């Protein structure tokens, strides 16, 4: 199954972009959760503005859907500068990056999503740009080729990635600020759901907000998607009023259980328990057993299951925990 087809997928979906922009916080004061990140960024931004300097280059990493792009835009708004957005796979040629860099104004932000997917050639262009605000460009070809240096205005590179370990050391070491985004707790997600409901003029009870939040896998993007689907259900079944009971009914219809699991999560956990006696089981064997790519298991399914204590990664393989048996209604003695 394609990850983006899941209602609880943390991957962005194109049709959600317009609504997401409308409900996205613009300033740190509106940014809910991630208290350590918020406090640090407030200090770093104020210090840069006091010194009339560009903010240090910033790397933001963490699971998808936690607000890396949102934070990059907030930084630009707080600094009062423009932000130019691109992504690693889009920057295929050094000239593409050079064009973006030379069009930056002083202190502007260049935001590169999926920065771990930059090609080595693009990284080579970035190194002097990040360190010295200089751009090395080759003019001509063959024996007549020569290198010229262009001065760039002071700027901030903000890179976002779900796979910080895939960044090369030379690139990672050039970021002066590194921030990791963690899964959100239910209280913070409830606040996010309430804020989104207010932006969308929804009639949402506090209990209804909590019901959506607790099934959102610690991820704001999922919370906002579930809220929109619950709104649809409430519009048809309850005159647009979202109560706790209406939210529960809608989420049951969507096959999202109280833990935020869908059938793919249950399929994975059941495979470990029923086919491999609870583990340990190697990733390749597990992928074959459930018919999914190992990357999908490693990057999409496992992080939340591990964070919630349903799965353990060990040197010998994946192991189901006692919480898994309890959730599946299976006795450990069976």
Swiss-Prot record:
Span list, region Large ATPase domain (RuvB-L): 4-184
Q: Where is this region: Small ATPAse domain (RuvB-S)?
A: 185-255
- Keyword field: ATP-binding, Cytoplasm, DNA damage, DNA recombination, DNA repair, DNA-binding, Hydrolase, Nucleotide-binding
Binding-site residues, DNA: 294, 313, 318
Record carries keyword DNA-binding: yes
Residues holding Mg(2+):
69
Asked whether the keyword Metal-binding is assigned, the reply is: no
Listed under catalytic activity are: ATP + H2O = ADP + phosphate + H(+)
Q: Which residues bind ATP?
A: 23-24, 65, 68-70, 131-133, 174, 184, 221
State a single Gene Ontology molecular function. Answer: four-way junction DNA binding
Q: What is the protein's major site of localization?
A: cytoplasm
Single Gene Ontology BP annotation: DNA repair
- The EC designation for this entry is 3.6.4.-
Per the record, the domain of life is Bacteria
- From the UniProt entry, list the residue stretches annotated as the region Head domain (RuvB-H): 258-334
Q: Which Gene3D superfamilies match?
A: 1.10.8.60, P-loop containing nucleotide triphosphate hydrolases (3.40.50.300), Winged helix-like DNA-binding domain superfamily/Winged helix DNA-binding domain (1.10.10.10)
Q: Cellular component GO terms, alphabetically? A: cytoplasm; Holliday junction resolvase complex
Q: Where, subcellularly, is it found?
A: Cytoplasm
* Biological role stated in the UniProt entry: The RuvA-RuvB-RuvC complex processes Holliday junction (HJ) DNA during genetic recombination and DNA repair, while the RuvA-RuvB complex plays an important role in the rescue of blocked DNA replication forks via replication fork reversal (RFR). RuvA specifically binds to HJ cruciform DNA, conferring on it an open structure. The RuvB hexamer acts as an ATP-dependent pump, pulling dsDNA into and through the RuvAB complex. RuvB forms 2 homohexamers on either side of HJ DNA bound by 1 or 2 RuvA tetramers; 4 subunits per hexamer contact DNA at a time.
Quaternary structure and interacting proteins, as annotated: Homohexamer. Forms an RuvA(8)-RuvB(12)-Holliday junction (HJ) complex. HJ DNA is sandwiched between 2 RuvA tetramers; dsDNA enters through RuvA and exits via RuvB. An RuvB hexamer assembles on each DNA strand where it exits the tetramer. Each RuvB hexamer is contacted by two RuvA subunits (via domain III) on 2 adjacent RuvB subunits; this complex drives branch migration. In the full resolvosome a probable DNA-RuvA(4)-RuvB(12)-RuvC(2) complex forms which resolves the HJ.
Entries under NCBIfam families matching the protein: PRK00080.1, ruvB
Family, similarity comment: Belongs to the RuvB family.
Q: What is known of its domains?
A: Has 3 domains, the large (RuvB-L) and small ATPase (RuvB-S) domains and the C-terminal head (RuvB-H) domain. The head domain binds DNA, while the ATPase domains jointly bind ATP, ADP or are empty depending on the state of the subunit in the translocation cycle. During a single DNA translocation step the structure of each domain remains the same, but their relative positions change.
The protein, known as? Holliday junction branch migration complex subunit RuvB
What organism is the protein native to? Haemophilus ducreyi (strain 35000HP / ATCC 700724)
- Lineage of this protein's species? Bacteria, Pseudomonadati, Pseudomonadota, Gammaproteobacteria, Pasteurellales
Gene name of this polypeptide: ruvB
């Amino acid at each position: 199954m394609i990850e983006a087809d899941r209602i609880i997928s943390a991957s962005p979906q194109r049709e959600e972009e317009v609504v997401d922009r409308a409900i996205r916080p613009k300033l740190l004061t509106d940014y809910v959760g991630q208290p350590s990140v918020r406090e640090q960024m407030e200090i770093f931004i104020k210090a840069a503005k006091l010194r009339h300097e560009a903010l240090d280059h910033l790397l933001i990493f963490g699971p998808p859907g936690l607000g890396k792009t949102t934070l990059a835009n907030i930084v630009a708004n707080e600094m009062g500068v423009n932000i130019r957005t691109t992504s690693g796979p889009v920057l295929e040629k050094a000239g593409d990056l050079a064009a973006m860099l030379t069009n930056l104004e002083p202190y502007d932000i260049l935001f590169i999503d999926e920065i771990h997917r930059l090609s080595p050639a693009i990284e080579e262009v970035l190194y002097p740009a990040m360190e010295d605000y200089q751009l090395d460009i080759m003019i001509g070809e063959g024996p007549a080729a020569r290198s010229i240096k262009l001065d760039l205005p002071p700027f901030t590179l903000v890179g976002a990635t779900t796979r910080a370990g895939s960044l090369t050391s030379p690139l990672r070491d050039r970021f002066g600020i590194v921030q990791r985004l963690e899964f959100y707790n239910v209280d913070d997600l409830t606040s996010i759901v309430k804020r989104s409901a207010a932006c969308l003029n929804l009639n949402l009870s506090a209990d209804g907000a909590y019901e959506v939040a607790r099934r959102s896998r610690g991820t704001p993007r999922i919370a906002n998607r579930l809220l929109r689907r619950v709104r649809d259900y409430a519009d048809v079944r309850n005159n647009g009023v979202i109560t706790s009971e209406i939210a529960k009914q809608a989420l049951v219809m969507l096959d999202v259980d109280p833990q935020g699991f869908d059938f793919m999560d249950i399929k994975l956990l059941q495979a470990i328990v029923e086919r491999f006696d609870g583990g340990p089981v190697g990733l390749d064997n597990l992928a074959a057993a459930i018919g999914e790519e190992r990357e999908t298991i490693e990057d999409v399914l496992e992080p939340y299951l591990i964070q919630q204590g349903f799965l353990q990664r060990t040197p010998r393989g994946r192991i189901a925990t006692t919480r898994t048996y309890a959730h599946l209604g299976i006795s450990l003695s069976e």
